[in-house]
């Protein structure tokens, strides 16, 4: 039998037990919801309950029929809810069920209180001690409007949803309030930052042992490894990384020529130290270096600007070594193969040849 | 509102926070015989000053919740509408 009631007086638990009693039942389960005396540090004096009586009873009866369809073995069901002012620590709701075996009784009561909090139109207001304003409570389970009721009528704009829910894994829909969203974004940014930081450390400090690893995605220009040795605090081995994509590469690199000019305070081609010196210097040695470094040379150029060019090249090579040859695009090199030496080939006539042979013969005869 | 189509007189009940905002437990209102739930909600919210809780309200028509706001509601004379703020029973 179903016992559904809204009551204005204290609920008598003994009476509930009488309602549940049945000779064929081995289990009766009783849930008693009582009023707490505190909320967020505020002392609760009492609670005021109100209900949409007729609808509340209707919903409570619906819960009973739901329970019976889910657990057909249930014998008696009791749902009592108290209304009006309820002092703290008194029962505001009692849900009870009896059944031949315990599992139905226990599960159904648990299900019923969840349903009651979700569907039954009853409200409570907490009245606090002191100057705090009383507050209408809200069950987290409470039935709520499904859509956000903004001025825009979403319902009027049907949205076609693809049958297959193949949402890219990278996309996530999040429905939260602004504060929560801000918090999550902050967490995300912080985590990304940490990730990048740790990656940077890995970039710089990776083991030589795993040198077969591909570092082409690393932004680091150097790799280092700590090699522990006895009697030593630290041994850091550094090697350079061939990285064509790194921000320091190529275009982004400082203009060494300009920097060096600044350092030397020289204006290219304008300072012209002693011409004797230029002439006296054997240019061949410099030329050899220049050609080795793929520099176009001009013997008439100021010797200092030529040396400077070599220095620039050295700096550049240092910054990109050792594989510089693969990606330094330079002016066409002056390393064309030297013109072949013209060796005049002498041609002999038949008479000359026979005379020559005769000469050898005669000579052999003389000796 | 009442300009086009027939209208019916409907009872409106207020509870908890909505009762305090509307300053009355019950009222009567003239409504068209057919209206979408979202329009109905807008109408009631503006008529009874329920704006502070409009996003948390749910309506009950003749003691049944209106779950879907795009639903078309048909009214008869003397129907009962309830303004239901979030529940807190138990």
UniProtKB/Swiss-Prot annotation, chain A:
Pathway: Cofactor biosynthesis; molybdopterin biosynthesis. It is found in: Cytoplasm. Its main location: cytoplasm. Keywords: Cytoplasm, Molybdenum cofactor biosynthesis, Transferase. Its EC number is 2.8.1.12. Disulfide bonds: none annotated. GO terms for biological process: chromatin remodeling; Mo-molybdopterin cofactor biosynthetic process. Transmembrane segments: none annotated. The keyword Transferase applies. One of its GO terms (cellular component) is polytene chromosome. Substrate binds at residues 101-102, 117, 124-126. Belongs to the MoaE family. MOCS2B subfamily. Catalytic subunit of the molybdopterin synthase complex, a complex that catalyzes the conversion of precursor Z into molybdopterin. Acts by mediating the incorporation of 2 sulfur atoms from thiocarboxylated Mocs2A into precursor Z to generate a dithiolene group. This protein is produced by a bicistronic gene which also produces the small subunit (Mocs2A). Heterotetramer; composed of 2 small (Mocs2A) and 2 large (Mocs2B) subunits. This is Molybdopterin synthase catalytic subunit. It comes from Drosophila yakuba (Fruit fly).
Swiss-Prot record, chain B:
Keywords: Cytoplasm, Molybdenum cofactor biosynthesis, Nucleotide-binding, Phosphoprotein. One of its GO terms (molecular function) is molybdopterin synthase activity. One of its GO terms (cellular component) is molybdopterin adenylyltransferase complex. The keyword Phosphoprotein applies. C-terminal thiocarboxylation occurs in 2 steps, it is first acyl-adenylated (-COAMP) via the hesA/moeB/thiF part of MOCS3, then thiocarboxylated (-COSH) via the rhodanese domain of MOCS3. Its main location: cytoplasm. Pfam families: ThiS. Pathway: Cofactor biosynthesis; molybdopterin biosynthesis. The modification Glycyl adenylate is found at residue 90. Disulfide bonds: none annotated. It is found in: Cytoplasm. This protein is produced by a bicistronic gene which also produces the large subunit (Mocs2B). Heterotetramer; composed of 2 small (Mocs2A) and 2 large (Mocs2B) subunits. Belongs to the MoaD family. MOCS2A subfamily. Acts as a sulfur carrier required for molybdopterin biosynthesis. Component of the molybdopterin synthase complex that catalyzes the conversion of precursor Z into molybdopterin by mediating the incorporation of 2 sulfur atoms into precursor Z to generate a dithiolene group. In the complex, serves as sulfur donor by being thiocarboxylated (-COSH) at its C-terminus by MOCS3. After interaction with Mocs2B, the sulfur is then transferred to precursor Z to form molybdopterin. This is Molybdopterin synthase sulfur carrier subunit.
């Amino acid at each position: 039998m179903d016992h559904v009631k809204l009551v204005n007086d204290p609920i008598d638990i003994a009476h509930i037990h009488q309602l549940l009693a049945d000779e064929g039942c081995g289990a009766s389960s009783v849930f008693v919801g009582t009023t707490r005396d505190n909320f967020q540090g505020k002392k609760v004096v009492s609670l005021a309950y109100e209900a949409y009586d007729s609808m509340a009873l209707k919903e409570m009866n619906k819960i009973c029929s739901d329970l019976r369809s889910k657990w057909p073995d249930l014998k008696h069901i009791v749902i009592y809810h108290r209304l009006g002012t309820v002092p703290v620590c008194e029962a505001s709701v009692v849900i009870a069920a009896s059944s031949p075996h315990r599992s139905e009784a226990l599960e159904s009561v648990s299900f019923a209180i969840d349903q009651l909090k979700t569907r039954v139109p009853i409200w409570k207001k907490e009245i606090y001690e002191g100057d705090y304003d009383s507050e209408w409570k809200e069950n987290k389970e409470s039935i709520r409007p499904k859509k956000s009721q903004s001025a825009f009528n979403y319902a009027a704009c049907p949205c076609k949803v693809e049958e297959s829910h193949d949402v890219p894994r990278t996309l996530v829909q999040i429905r939260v309030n602004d504060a929560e969203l801000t918090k999550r974004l902050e967490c995300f940014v912080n985590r990304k930052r940490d990730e990048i930081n740790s990656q940077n450390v890995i970039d710089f400090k990776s083991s030589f042992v795993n040198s077969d690893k591909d570092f082409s995605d690393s932004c680091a220009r150097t790799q280092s490894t700590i090699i522990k040795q006895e009697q030593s605090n630290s041994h850091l081995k550094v090697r350079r990384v061939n990285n064509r994509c790194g921000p320091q590469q190529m275009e982004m690199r400082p203009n060494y020529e300009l920097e060096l000019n600044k350092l030397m305070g020289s204006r290219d081609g304008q300072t012209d130290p002693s011409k004797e010196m230029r002439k006296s210097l054997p240019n061949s040695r410099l030329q050899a270096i220049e050609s080795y470094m793929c520099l176009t040379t001009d013997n008439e150029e100021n010797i200092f600007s030529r040396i400077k060019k070599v220095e620039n090249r050295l700096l550049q090579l240092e910054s990109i070594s050792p594989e510089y040859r693969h990606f330094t695009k330079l002016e066409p090199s002056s390393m064309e193969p030297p013109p072949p030496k013209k060796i005049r080939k002498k041609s002999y006539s038949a008479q000359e040849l026979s005379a020559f042979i005769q000469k050898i013969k005669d000579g052999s005869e003389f000796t | 509102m009442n300009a086009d189509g027939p209208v019916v007189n409907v009872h409106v009940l207020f509870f908890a926070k909505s009762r305090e905002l509307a300053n009355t437990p019950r009222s009567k209102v003239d409504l068209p015989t057919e209206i979408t739930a979202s329009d109905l909600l807008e109408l009631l919210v503006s008529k009874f000053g329920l704006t502070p809780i409009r996003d948390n309200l749910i309506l009950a028509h003749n003691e049944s919740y209106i779950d879907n706001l795009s639903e078309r509601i048909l009214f008869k004379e003397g129907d009962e509408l309830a303004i239901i703020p979030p529940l807190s029973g138990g």
